[in-house]
């Protein structure tokens, strides 16, 4: 019989030699164990052989050949073991020796255990007792082998990427920001000078969670300096693609720095401004090194005075000083290159643009809410100016003034931006190109903003549908002729000609149809005014700390009002006063006694029992209807089929929002009070919401950051700022321009 080595190398000749060498060594080791009575009783040969077989297959060996190899090796080892058992002569009681070994293995000292095992005549290794066998494998070599295997498997599968909470993500939870930053961006500042920062990732697959594929044989191309909007329906995998890029699960060049605004900043005692400055790890390290060198130079000046001028000690100090001076010059040059002296002013400008006052910038980060810490994360990323900036729904955490600032900032951003967003106005302002993720692929619309993309996409779809329909008609015509004359002697030649034509026609797939969702708010009966009226309303913790002062606002049945302003200026508070959830310190709130209000909060999910279905939750929270009536009502908001019967924890964010819209309409409201209704809805959902609000015969009052939704629905703009709420004369775009002009006058937009 051929040796184990020759068998393995013959069966796995195409894979990396380091893997075959490891397999040969492992099998030879198993062979040696068959001569040891104690160890042979502790090893399951079939399990061990299968372990090595799986390793060979993962490295690229043929499954059929490996199966044949494993059967041969297992048969050989089993036969060898039986023959050796008959020849072995053991001294003493074997079971007693095994008991002694198990007792020893519970001892604390590994070195003592291994010595004791040796004295018993058992060649054991406590480091590998989990496998109950000795292994002489070099762990470093094994790690190297596994890395090579992984690379080969990736190459064989066209850079297949399976993303399921990668190790790197888990590591981030355990380590600090600096370590994670350096792990993702290992190259020092300035090391990428002269290198192309275009990104081209060819033919890769992307999976998520339990193996669901979201991209198949896809290509990703990002030209340096372009700003890409990544769009697609909710749940299509856009955020997963960003995470795979940010963790370098995909093959992004190492010299391209990456930052992903994904998680809110952890709060501590660091001031907001300093936390932004600290985000640039390279600058932080250079400044720290500079400070250490300067401290050492001061120490050397003191030491020098203790020695004679021509002494050996002074010469050593002078040599050290020369080295440190040279190093200090290098550090200084790098700090100049990164304009370190302007860093604080730039960081302050970014923070101010995102809504942090000068006073707030000096507050510790742990004093801010989660939403404001998300803004800090965004500010830190903007300050660092990575080569590739990844943003996931950035406008969801911002108000209209901050979104306006962010859009202006990104329009002059010198590097590459890839942002997921459903905010049309934001994408129209920012994006130079659109990437459309759908049907496990990425389609590129170069040089197009969102509106142009939307029009072009629809034209492409119509053209594809027209081409498909025409071919189906032509195919039918050819097939009818063939069926009619195939066996007709006079026409058979023509029939054969048409058969050839039919065979040569390209196979066209029916064009993908965009999913449509319909929202329908129920009609309400008319009411006589006043509907909701606020007169000289003031609200605060006390009269010396008023959040709102002397507010006058009138909401009618035909009102379409947008309430805008910076976060924290009292917009949601005003809604709660109108809902009678809060009482004003002074002033009057008049409401029609027959008034019914549908109230949508931005935290609507908090009030839902996600462990139940939408139908069950609605029947418990809003009793009085049959399950069939609840299902029909949910269908008016796109929750159709079995969706209403599934546990709500299985629904997407957009689907949960639609359940919330359905719930608020159960009482046939006269007025819809909506607090950030566009959050979690994709473009299709937003279109449906806008149309439904346009057709609603009651009044609408909304707080929203989505300029497109406001422009499409609202006729009045009311601005909450500095404790007042006043009507703005103009459109939402006029208000946006007013915000930018004010920021520009203060030097905020220009400074960055």
Swiss-Prot record:
Residues given in the record as ATP 2 binding sites: 565-572
Q: Which GO terms describe its molecular function?
A: ATP binding; ATP hydrolysis activity; ribosome binding; translation initiation factor binding
An example GO BP is:
positive regulation of phosphorylation
Q: What happens when the gene is disrupted?
A: Inhibits GCN4 derepression in amino acid or purine-starved cells. Attenuates GCN4 derepression in glucose-starved cells.
- Report the residues modified as N-acetylalanine: 2
Domain ABC transporter, residue spans: 199-464, 532-748
Protein origin, superkingdom: Eukaryota
The residues listed in the UniProt record as binding ATP 1, with positions renumbered to this chain, are 232-239
Listed under GO cellular component are:
cytosolic ribosome
Q: What keywords is this UniProt entry annotated with? A: Acetylation, Activator, ATP-binding, Nucleotide-binding, Repeat, Stress response, Translation regulation
Give the CDD domains listed for this entry.
Answer: ABCF_EF-3
Q: Describe the protein's quaternary organization and the partners it interacts with.
A: Interacts (via N-terminus) with GCN1 (via C-terminus); this interaction stimulates GCN2 kinase activity in response to amino acid starvation. The GCN1-GCN20 complex interacts with GCN2 on translating ribosomes in amino acid-starved cells; this association stimulates GCN2 kinase activation by uncharged tRNAs, and hence allowing GCN4 translational activation and derepression of amino acid biosynthetic genes. Associates with ribosomes.
Query: Its function?
Result: Acts as a positive activator of the GCN2 protein kinase activity in response to in response to low amino acid, carbon, or purine availability. Component of the GCN1-GCN20 complex that forms a complex with GCN2 on translating ribosomes; during this process, GCN20 helps GCN1 to act as a chaperone to facilitate delivery of uncharged tRNAs that enter the A site of ribosomes to the tRNA-binding domain of GCN2, and hence stimulating GCN2 kinase activity.
What else is on record for this protein? Present with 14600 molecules/cell in log phase SD medium.
Similarity comment text for this entry: Belongs to the ABC transporter superfamily. ABCF family. EF3 subfamily.
Q: What name appears for this protein in its UniProt entry? A: Protein GCN20
Q: Which organism is it from?
A: Saccharomyces cerevisiae (strain ATCC 204508 / S288c)
Give the encoding gene's name: GCN20
């Amino acid at each position: 019989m051929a040796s184990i080595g020759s068998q393995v190398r013959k069966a796995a000749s195409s894979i990396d030699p380091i893997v075959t060498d490891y397999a040969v060594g492992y099998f030879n080791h198993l062979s040696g164990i068959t001569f040891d009575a104690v160890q042979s009783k502790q090893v399951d040969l079939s399990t061990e052989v299968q372990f090595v077989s799986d390793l060979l297959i993962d490295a690229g060996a043929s499954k059929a050949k490996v199966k044949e190899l494993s059967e041969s090796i297992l048969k050989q080892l089993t036969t060898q073991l039986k023959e050796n058992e008959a020849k072995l002569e053991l001294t003493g009681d074997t079971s007693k020796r095994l008991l002694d070994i198990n007792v020893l293995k519970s001892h604390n000292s590994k070195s003592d255990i291994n010595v004791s095992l040796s004295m018993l005549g058992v060649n054991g290794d406590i480091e590998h007792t989990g496998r109950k066998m000795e292994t002489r494998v070099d762990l470093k070599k094994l790690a190297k082998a596994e890395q090579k295997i992984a690379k080969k498997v990736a190459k064989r599968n066209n850079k297949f990427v399976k993303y399921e909470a990668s190790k790197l993500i888990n590591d981030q939870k355990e380590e600090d920001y600096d370590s994670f930053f350096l792990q993702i961006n290992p190259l020092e500042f300035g090391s990428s000078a002269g290198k192309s920062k275009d990104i081209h990732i060819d033919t890769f697959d992307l999976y998520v969670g339990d193996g669901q594929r979201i991209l198949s044989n896809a290509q990703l191309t990002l030209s340096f300096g372009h700003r890409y909007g990544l769009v697609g329906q909710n749940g299509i995998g856009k955020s997963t693609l960003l995470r795979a890029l940010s963790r370098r699960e995909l093959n992004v060049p190492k010299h391209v720095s990456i930052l992903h605004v994904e998680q809110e900043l952890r709060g501590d005692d660091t001031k907001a401004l300093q936390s932004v400055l600290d985000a640039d790890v390279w600058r932080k390290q250079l400044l720290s090194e500079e400070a250490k060198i300067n401290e050492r130079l001061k120490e050397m000046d003191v030491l020098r005075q203790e020695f004679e001028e021509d002494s050996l000690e002074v010469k050593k100090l002078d040599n050290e000083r020369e080295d440190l001076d040279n190093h200090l010059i290098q550090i200084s040059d790098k700090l100049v290159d990164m304009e370190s002296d302007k860093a604080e002013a730039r960081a302050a400008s970014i923070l101010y643009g995102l809504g942090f006052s000068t006073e707030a910038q000096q507050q510790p980060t742990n004093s801010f809410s989660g939403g404001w810490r998300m803004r800090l994360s965004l500010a830190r990323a903007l300050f660092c100016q990575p080569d590739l900036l990844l943003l996931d729904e950035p406008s969801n955490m911002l108000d209209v003034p901050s979104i306006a600032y962010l859009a202006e900032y990104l329009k002059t951003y010198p590097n590459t931006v890839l942002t997921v967003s459903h905010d049309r106005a934001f994408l129209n302002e920012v994006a130079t190109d659109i990437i459309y993720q759908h049907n496990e692929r990425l389609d590129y619309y170069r040089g197009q903003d969102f509106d142009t993309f939307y029009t072009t996409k629809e034209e492409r779809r119509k053209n594809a549908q027209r081409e498909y329909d025409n071919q189906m008609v032509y195919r039918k015509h050819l097939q009818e002729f063939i069926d009619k004359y195939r066996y007709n002697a006079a026409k058979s030649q023509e029939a054969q000609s048409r058969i050839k034509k039919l065979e040569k026609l390209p196979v066209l797939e029916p064009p993908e149809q965009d999913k449509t969702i319909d929202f329908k708010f129920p009609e309400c009966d008319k009411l006589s005014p006043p509907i909701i009226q606020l007169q000289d309303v003031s609200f605060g913790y006390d009269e010396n700390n008023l959040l709102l002062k002397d507010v006058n606002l009138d909401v009618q049945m035909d009102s379409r009002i947008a309430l805008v302003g910076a976060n924290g200026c009292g917009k949601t508070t005003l809604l709660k006063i109108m809902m009678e959830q809060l009482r004003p310190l002074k002033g009057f709130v008049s409401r029609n006694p027959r008034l019914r209000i549908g109230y949508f909060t931005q935290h609507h999910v908090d009030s839902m029992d996600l462990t139940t279905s939408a139908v069950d939750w609605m029947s418990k929270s809003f009793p009085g209807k049959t399950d069939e009536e609840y299902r029909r009502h949910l269908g008016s908001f796109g929750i159709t089929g079995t969706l209403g019967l599934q546990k709500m924890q299985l629904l997407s964010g957009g689907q949960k929002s639609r359940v919330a819209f359905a719930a608020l309409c159960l009482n046939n409201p006269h007025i819809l009070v909506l607090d950030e209704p566009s959050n979690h809805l994709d473009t299709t959902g937003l279109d449906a919401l806008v149309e439904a609000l346009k057709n609603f015969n009651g009044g609408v009052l909304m707080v929203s950051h989505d300029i497109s939704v406001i422009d499409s629905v609202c006729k009045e703009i009311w601005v909450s700022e500095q404790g007042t709420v006043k009507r703005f004369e103009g459109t939402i775009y006029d208000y946006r321009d007013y915000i930018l002009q004010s920021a520009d006058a203060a030097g905020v937009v220009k400074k960055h």
